[in-house]
């Protein structure tokens, strides 16, 4: 009996212990749930306080809560309570020497204090802060807008965002209107080792520094002409070596130096080498179809003078001609309507409309051309223009001035093409500036004035010994009202380069001369201000590009842009 009662007592004690243990688990679970609710409520309150911003403890009328550093930073026995708490009523908590080490915070700043002293959190937040440091787009755009061209091109390499921002039409327009651009001179068709290298040499006038732009599109291509408008350079025509023969080009290449981009536009109707080219802006009412009709009507009336009447000709030929004429008029009307519709649609999308003119040059078989073509940027098409006047001769130079394309021939004749009305005008000038025929003259338009540079022998009676052995380059101006030439100035350098090229920038004339002497290629860059009374020339740059060129650039050409 004693043996059986002992196990029963043991089992009873074990069951009681289990019941106590069960109660303890329930108590723990209940306490845990209450603790979670309290923590969640505290976090919500802290978030609300942070959203409202930190409140200065001195501005609270009911007192402040002293920060409880908690078990993370101090021992729990050193916990401090503010005068506003229930446990601290009647106690002075901000006096006494032992309270000097305790800081007073706004309620809900304990988490901030912990973040401030946690090294790992500071390291992570510092990295995140550095990742999100950036300038607003408008301020970044203003900074990029004021950079010089070389620095702006380097900024393109920073990221895709900067590159896309600096290539938009809005950015280029704001840069242009803000007068942040500087003049750049681009030299084409430089010869090296007996052939065209294809490189483009850009000269920053403001910095007096040359830059080389490598490209494979112009390698081996020569005898082309260039012109510039709207921050772009147009390379027109030219030739290249095709195995054992020469190939003439009709295509047009467009180079944008500000973004280092190339593109193509519609090709000319005829292949041309060394054509005389020019570009100018036109109004939205300009139409190449209208100028073509005006030329046909003008030719038609001129051809009928002194001729027979249509009534007395062969009736069959008369009917066929009238039928062809009516069909041509109908086709012309339809094509004109289509072009006008396309023109109106493109004018809404385009900013500024311009035309590109190419006249003269040599054809496929080196024959001189007296025809011309005009390109309309709105329709991206070329159309024939009226031929040069009879007996005009081979065109040697040309320039656009005040809406007139002036062309000068090897026979010392001057003609002007009215771009808006579409016909040539023969201009009789006096006296004709004397010149040495081995040196071609150059027409330049500067500040709505027409100039010509030509090489002539020294005048008699100037005291020079052997005057027939000395040639000078003179600058002449044409009076557009009285059509008379007047000598303006004399270039200080001897005319060693027979293909010296000149461009203008407002009232400044710029010229580049390159020639080979004693086995060395020399280059000179000179400028002239035509607004001054003396109109004197001065040297700007010497022998900077000629060091890497071993041949004189007989076919060189230049273009000026503001970038």
Swiss-Prot record:
UniProtKB keywords: Kelch repeat, Repeat
GO annotation, biological process: regulation of cell growth; regulation of cell size
Residue ranges occupied by any F-box domain in the UniProt entry: 129-175
Kelch repeat coordinates: 184-231, 232-282, 355-402
PROSITE patterns: FBOX
GO CC terms in record: SCF ubiquitin ligase complex
Pfam family, one: Kelch_6
Name of the protein in question: F-box/kelch-repeat protein At5g42350
Source organism per UniProt: Arabidopsis thaliana (Mouse-ear cress)
Organismal lineage: Eukaryota, Viridiplantae, Streptophyta, Embryophyta, Tracheophyta
